[in-house]
Amino acid sequence: IMPNQVFEKHVWAEIDLDALRQNFRAVKQRAGELPLCAVVKADSYGHGAVQCARVFAQEGASWLAVSCLAEALQLRRSSQTLPILILGHVQPTYAAALIRDDITAACYSLPQAKALSEAAQAAGGRVKVHLAVDTGMGRIGFALRTDFDAAIAEAIAACTLPGLEMTGLFQHFSVADDTAEENIVYTAEQHALFVRAFHALKAAGHEPQTVHCDNSAGVMLHPDWPEGLARERCMARPGIILYGYDPSDEVRFGQFRPVMTLKTVVSMVKEMQPGQSASYGRRFTAEKPTLVATLCTGYADGYPRQLSCGKGIVEIHGKACPVLGRVCMDQMMVDVTGIPDIREGDEAILWGGSVSDTAETIARKTDTISYEVLCGVSRRVPRVYLEHGKIVDVEDWILKA
């Protein structure tokens, strides 16, 4: 079967699988002998989980991590055979699906464990679980910081329930990507609690097979964090760095290549005369003859409306073009006065070019993080997968549906 290589050049996201491979290898080199669990939740941060998981599997990933059951089933239906961990909530009623497709669930409280145990027994099997402990994130997990002994007692009780097979232990750092002194201390406290939990479970006869606490910042900054744990059982769990972005402005490594480039095309070019205005609210009025290009993309595709009125920078013909007026749902306008040879159909780079914005600069301009910018690219935007500069596949959710 030939890969789908056809897509409408309206707005699309180019996914550089060579960059993805390079990023994985860079993390692997830093992690040393630690196995890697590649985080592919949220459709691989907007990049396309099926294709990204395929690359990670080829490069030697040991696990894949997702957020929900649907994401796990998508991977299984794409013939993905790597172990899959659901980091978030799963309804116990879906225990049969977890068993059938060999998907590992997070177990994060005794009531949740009991419900999952009952459902697993009714399904006639055992659900594999990784215990999630809350060392300071404040989300799901046995609450070690509130009452360590009580939380460990509940975790041990969960391990003894019929229908459950405890195979792992994990937690999540809340400020590992922050270099403020108090946050460095807080991260160390989280790690110490996690180590303490591991040894408490081991002493009770429930030593986890797999232990993981390192996120992107953790694996890069602290390759020594398996210290205090059984190193042969440890695993790192990188996320955002696999897709080419640093965890935060404070924690930067400068060795990862952004994987996604968001592109669109020019749909019309016109010259606006002094006094003429553009877009909703008439927020832009020309003070001099201005060449304006309309682009066939907008906030419905994931280009933030906060980049209206000159905040956003688009690249056309290698030149920086500021956004004019407000970004619309499906269209936007940019100033192309310095590009006299521009034509309808010309390519425009929304982010990821040499002079355009990046997901990180957009995040700064819109008071968010690169994660949200990447995840915000909507499903009406085809993902175009490239290897060695050539299209190897296209994923178009609208046409597939």
Which residues does each predicted region cover?
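A charged N-terminal "starter" segment
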Residues: 1-104, 118, 126, 165, ...
